[in-house]
Amino acid sequence: MFKLYTDAATMNKLGYSSGGILIIHNKRQIQIKVKLKANNNHDAEFEACLMGFKKVKEIAEKNETIIYYTDSKIVYDSLEKRYAKHYQLQLNKILSLQDSFSLVINNWISDKKNEGAHNLAQQALHSFY
């Protein structure tokens, strides 16, 4: 079983974004900070999610269960409905990755409970820009 946490941070006035990805497997953590192309927070949250699932796919077997955590309501709702009016292209890429695993459980969590990925995203934002 893999636990995946993602979060994004955006400097709204400048349009810079970064992401934090936290992967937990067998009590080991993989912490990843990434520079994102997105220039607003919603795009950045989808991009961070996509990058998180790409990283998990690199290290997980197809028969693994992935438990995904996000504090982005729009990402969570879109994943559950498998529909996003303005983000369908990004969503389809994420769903394709999710469908490659035997089971993915999506969870919405509060900002406070997503502190690990949040801190990584903030650190990345300040180190990249």
How should these model regions be labeled?
Residues 1, 127-129:
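Short, Lys/Arg-enriched, disordered terminal segments
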Residues 1-43, 55:
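RNase H-like nuclease fold core
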Residues 43, 47-51:
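Short amphipathic alpha-helical face segments that pack within enzyme cores
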